[in-house]
Amino acid sequence: FPGHGNTSADSHYGAVYVERTLDELRENELLPFQAGIDAGADLVMVGHLIVSDIDSEPAPFSYAIVTELLRQEMGFTGVVITDGLQMQAMTDHYSSAEIAVKAVQAGVDLLLCPLDLESAVTALKEAVESGEITEARLDESVQRILELKLKMGLLV
């Protein structure tokens, strides 16, 4: 999310820019995501895409993309996961600690494969202690994750 189809770069190796406007995305790339949401998709992966028309930050760090577009406008209520955080689109520009905090602030629930898990966890703990991230924000993610685990039969 929000759609890698109209790009020529690979976020495994560097930054990827989506040059479409938000209206163009709504008319193209967002259509299958909306269909999935309408059909009851439980999880959406946010790709390491920079959609310049929406935000200068990569999508996993963008409150405008994760919370305002995906959750509020498109009505997604499930779990949001990042693409692999070991990919160069992320690691060339951000530490694991920065990635963790920025993604959670944007509304992401799960962080996939941070290079340095310990520093990511420490940064999140410190962000909560300092008030940079509220406990309520973490509780939202925990609730969504537990609901998905329950639905999948992973909790008894």
PLM regions: where:
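Second-shell residues forming the walls of enzyme active-site clefts
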Residues: 1-126, 132-137, 144
